[in-house]
């Protein structure tokens, strides 16, 4: 029998359902430098990064948007669950219609220029509605499984990835209680994040959580949940969707992780792209390397990378009666 025909081109199944030409752009080197190397470097500094933020800033709405402009494209469309409000004379970034799938948190870096040139076609629909429309049009992605894995980490095994790419940063060390006593050993600081409870391997009368990563001593500091509460943080690389920082402190609802619950806070713009955020109640896992994003109702106002959590804001005996608000003890 004749040999089987060669497989169709990568995008052929999509091309059958669209009227658009496919154009490719090699950005592998840039992606490695701006996203993968950043991911590794942040873990080496004892921080917990979100690589999607770096990808959106430098790749999707950086290089890719500029490439679209070079092709004289009117817009760059992506599948993010978010909305752009163009009704008020300036562009506002709003949450997606599906609260379970909203992705506005990872888009806070978009300013007026970017929002003028992007489209989020599915942002006004729920995920269920989008799947239904895809089925009606016989699109092959209608039944595609969702994935929360890092796209550059095979099998979602980020631990093995870090051991391969930064073995010098993955060294065992002591687990200390808040008094400085060694109560166990950890497998490498990059494997832990503030607020984490699972996987510590310590038997104790009460549940213990990661309080902080002591990079200088390669030590993991743990303690009871009452030691976790923190009310303030400082963020860097701050972006304001309007393009202008507020001249006075503003009341906001803020998220400190992608799936975190919104929490009431006061946002104060500082100099040189910095901001200080003070929450009404302590949060238990404010983590350097993650983003803090400010909202007013459905509108995204600003966001930045958490740089610093003042030690003076650790919840001590005076705050034991006011429990910290947990955002989850899973790794980011």
In which residue ranges do the predicted regions lie?
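AMP-forming adenylation/ATP pyrophosphatase catalytic core
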Residues: 77-84, 89-332
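Short glycine-/small-residue-rich flexible loop motifs, especially phosphate/cofactor-binding loops
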Residues: 19, 65, 131
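Short, small-residue-biased leader/transition segments that mark boundaries at the very start
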Residues: 16-31
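Short, well-ordered junction/capping motifs at the entry into regular secondary structure
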Residues: 4-20
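A short acidic, often aromatic-flanked loop/helix-cap motif at beta-alpha or helix-coil junctions
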Residues: 32-33, 126
């Amino acid at each position: 029998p004749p040999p089987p025909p060669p497989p169709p081109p990568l995008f052929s199944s999509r091309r059958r359902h669209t009227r658009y030409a496919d154009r490719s752009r090699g950005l592998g080197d840039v992606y490695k430098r701006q996203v993968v190397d950043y991911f590794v470097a942040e873990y080496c500094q004892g921080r917990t990064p979100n690589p999607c933020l770096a990808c959106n800033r430098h790749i999707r709405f950086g290089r890719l948007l500029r490439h679209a402009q070079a092709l004289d494209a009117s817009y760059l469309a992506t599948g993010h669950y978010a909305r752009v409000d163009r009704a008020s004379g300036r562009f506002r970034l709003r949450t997606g219609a599906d609260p379970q799938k909203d992705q506005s948190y990872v888009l806070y870096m978009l300013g007026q220029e970017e929002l003028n040139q992007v489209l989020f076609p599915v942002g006004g629909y729920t995920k269920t509605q989008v799947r239904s429309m895809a089925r009606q049009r016989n699109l092959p992605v209608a039944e595609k499984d969702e994935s929360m894995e890092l796209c550059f980490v095979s099998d979602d095994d980020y631990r093995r990835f870090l051991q391969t790419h930064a073995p010098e940063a993955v060294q065992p060390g002591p687990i200390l209680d808040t008094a400085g006593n060694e109560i166990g050993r950890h497998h490498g600081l990059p494997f832990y994040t503030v607020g984490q409870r699972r996987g510590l391997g310590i038997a104790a009368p009460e549940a213990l959580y990661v309080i902080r990563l002591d990079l200088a001593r390669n030590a993991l500091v743990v303690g009871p949940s009452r030691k976790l509460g923190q009310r303030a943080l400082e963020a860097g690389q701050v972006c304001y969707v309007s393009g202008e920082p507020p001249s006075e402190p503003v009341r906001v609802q803020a998220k400190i992780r992608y799936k975190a619950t919104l929490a009431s806070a006061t946002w104060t713009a500082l100099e040189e792209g910095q901001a200080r955020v003070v929450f009404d109640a302590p949060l238990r896992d404010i983590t350097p390397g993650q983003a803090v994003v400010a909202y007013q109702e459905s509108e995204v106002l600003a966001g930045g990378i958490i740089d610093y959590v003042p030690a003076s804001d650790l919840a001590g005996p005076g705050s034991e009666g006011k429990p910290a608000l947990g955002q989850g003890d899973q790794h980011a």
